[in-house]
Amino acid sequence: SVENSRPTGQQLESLDLSAPWEQSLPCTERKPSATARLSRRGASLSSPAESSGSPQRRGLSAPSSRQIPAPQGAVLVQREKDLPNYNW
């Protein structure tokens, strides 16, 4: 259970760091609007995992590890598709 909790924490940290990093970019003023919406979805999925993850580590450790990478990939794909749409 400890091993599963470690990668989840690293993934959550990466999500937290990705949000301010995108917002810090001055050139992408229109992009943060789209990325912020997607980041909120990711945060909403990660926040319950953190709060409910502490009491139910065994139950959420396996599903959270499986659920986290799937949304990340989907979010990245959505960003790639959304950004060019805004640019055009």
UniProtKB/Swiss-Prot annotation:
Gene Ontology cellular component list: extracellular region
- What biological-process GO terms show up in the record? G protein-coupled receptor signaling pathway; positive regulation of cytosolic calcium ion concentration
| Record carries keyword Transcription | no
Q: Which Pfam families match?
A: Kisspeptin
Q: Where in the cell is it found?
A: Secreted
Record PANTHER family:
METASTASIS-SUPPRESSOR KISS-1
State the name under which the record lists this protein. Metastasis-suppressor KiSS-1
Tell me the organism: Macaca mulatta
Source organism lineage? Eukaryota, Metazoa, Chordata, Craniata, Vertebrata
What gene is it encoded by?
KISS1
